[in-house]
From Swiss-Prot:
Transmembrane feature ranges: none
Compartment(s) of residence: Cytoplasm
Family annotation (PANTHER family): CLASS I PEPTIDE CHAIN RELEASE FACTOR (PTHR43116:SF3), PEPTIDE CHAIN RELEASE FACTOR 2 (PTHR43116)
Gene giving rise to this polypeptide: prfB
Post-translational modification remark: Methylated by PrmC. Methylation increases the termination efficiency of RF2.
Residues annotated with N5-methylglutamine modification: 247
Organism: Phenylobacterium zucineum (strain HLK1)
Annotated protein name in UniProt: Peptide chain release factor 2
Key word Cell inner membrane present: no
Gene3D superfamilies given in the database record: 3.30.160.20, 3.30.70.1660, Release factor (1.20.58.410)
Family matches, as HAMAP family: Rel_fac_2 (MF_00094)
Family: Belongs to the prokaryotic/mitochondrial release factor family.
InterPro entries for the chain: PCRF, Pep_chain_release_fac_I, Pep_chain_release_fac_I_sf, PrfB
Amino acid sequence: MSRPPRPTSSSRSNCSGGVFDWEPALRKLDELNARVEDPTLWNDPDEAQAVSRERSRLSAQVEAVHGLERDLADALGYAELADEEGDEASLDEARAQLREIKERAARAELEALLSGEADGNDAYVEINSGAGGTESNDWAGMLLRMYTRWAQAHGMSVDVIEETAGEQAGIKSVTLQVKGTNAYGWLKTEAGVHRLVRISPYDSSARRHTSFASVWVYPVIDDNIEIEINPADVRTDTYRASGAGGQHVNKTDSAVRLTHIPTGIAVACQTQRSQHQNRDQAWKMLRARLYELELEKREAAQQALEDQKTDIGWGHQIRSYVLQPYQMVKDLRTEVETSDTQGVLDGDLDAFMGAALAQRVGATRDAAA
């Protein structure tokens, strides 16, 4: 077995110099540690929390690189010993370890791209079916399952905040709260229109149908972030919670919808039985939407890149899913594609997310150059 060289500080620098510059990262971490230890920092609680969050994020990235180095050195040492002893079984085990380390390194490299102001936050994900009735509703339901599977595979939790079921199948709309490290940073790459082409299971003539659904993603924001909202600018509507039915569906007008009149942004919550609780959650969601809008404006002003916006229209297709007459999922932004349609629909989205994230960061760097 031909063994690669052991890692050194030089090779480490070369490996991590693309999106995660090692020496600048260590200097930045030292600077953040010094700031956290400065008692005067805590005179401004908001600034102190921001510095602490940044230190935690960078510290986790540095530790991830250290962990990869340790595991790589161990795996190479194990492979060397197995090679000297002619132990093929142990060599196969070492190869498997190296493949796993390579996958972790690729993931760590992508994680280093998540440096946006809200990338580390939890995320709200809204899915809305397009025109087409049952077909589009079923497609929206398939997307709900896909994102739930993706989140669960990455150790994240998913709560349904609001859901409107389709008449025959699927959903008309749903709002999810995805909780986990960098949930927003990853999921923001999924904002856009998703197109499905298949032989309809609801068409007795077995004709091919095209369906659309939109995905909107925005960050869950901390309660201490100040978003000024004039109550006079918000219209409140109440209605009965809807869903799959059964004894748990509330028979009173406990669901709440808030509409921010100046922007037209509307949010709804029906998770709780209490109208008061639903109202509180809806206000949090509205603040988050307006916060995302503000982030969007900043990015647009700084980068002048309209295609970075998450404010989507039906013409903003990002991905096509073809199930018949052939099988292919293709991202229209990055050209990443795969014939493993079932794997994608089961939540295997990392290749698409990673490519879109790298493209975003590359566009941002080009704009800043």
